[in-house]
Curated annotation (Swiss-Prot):
InterPro entries: Glyco_trans_19 (IPR003835). The keyword Lyase does not apply. Keywords: Glycosyltransferase, Lipid A biosynthesis, Lipid biosynthesis, Lipid metabolism, Transferase. It catalyses: a lipid X + a UDP-2-N,3-O-bis[(3R)-3-hydroxyacyl]-alpha-D-glucosamine = a lipid A disaccharide + UDP + H(+). GO terms for molecular function: lipid-A-disaccharide synthase activity; phospholipid binding. The gene is lpxB. It comes from Pseudoalteromonas translucida (strain TAC 125). This is Lipid-A-disaccharide synthase.
Amino acid sequence: MNKDQKQLRIGIVAGELSGDILGEGLIKALKKHFPDAIFEGIAGPKMQAQGCNTLYDMDELSVMGLVEVLGRLPRLLKIRKQLVQHFIDNPPDVFIGIDAPDFNLRVEKPLKDAGIKTVQYVSPSVWAWREKRIHTISAATNLVLALLPFEKEFYDKHQVPCTFVGHTLADDIALEHDDSKARKELGLSPDDKVLALLPGSRGSEVGLLSETYIKTAVQLQAQNPALKIVVPLVNAKRKAQFTEILNATAPTLKISLLDGQSKQAMQAADAILLASGTATLEGMLYKKPMVVGYKIKPLSYWIFKTLFTFNIKYFSLPNLLADEELVPEFLQSECNVANLTQALTPMLNTDNQALKARFLAIHKKIRLNASEQAANAVAELINAN
């Protein structure tokens, strides 16, 4: 009897908000294959709204930073042990770990050893550093679902089963869009020249980057006094932190601080100065010229450089996807006012059509309807003998 014809149990774990969003789309798509499937594991509100039963509060897994993780370690280990035992006692037809690889791979390994099919949705950055983790991933999973094409190439090289499903952000953002609506929402006119500053979402990023970003904005506004500068800040705490640095650095700078609204700020901008991470992908999908400037604490940087080998030429996603430097990147001491100003000036004074065409081509390459692709791959794994 085909497994499509019986009620399935699908174990699924998301560790943070981004995973909950991916999980919501995946559950919706899996229901088309298995309308009566039971979903249970660790879910946020979006997955729960799709009918997923959560055995633990997802917030318990959303821990950032070494010190914070150590403080919560006994509880995390207890959850992991109980979760593994639950799924061994009540075997699902498949277990899907969404991102959170440090937690999920350690759940997947004992389940796979017990004969349960396992999937890791979102690859760890194993292609960039700590490459030996590929052996851990291979031992823990039957299938990896990769969001980016170069990730699949890496897994293929190591003969680890992997399906490239595309990126949900590329599905959510239109290939072409009208920026006038975003400008109107932010009180900007169609003729304004606009620079967006995105100094990160974490306190450490805002603390390390804001002064350099603000001083760069001062230089650019001196070149063009009509330049409008917008800064979306993720919450009230980050806004207060940025305001304090702004008042100490350039209290007379003409600048608009926004509550969230990062999507509108990106869409409205002629150019963006931003920290690394998913925001660089989002900026590319909005077809915006950008400069990436990033710093971490000198001691942390030294530890990373000393202990780990990095296998990448670039650290921003647009450049990794293009395998060339489409976006200027400045790290640590190179992330300075002179470099950032020099890189941004031409972006604010030309139409950047060739760059935007490259961004559009990459957008098309990763816009595959990721949730449907992921569900198809999971269904194929479930139905395989």
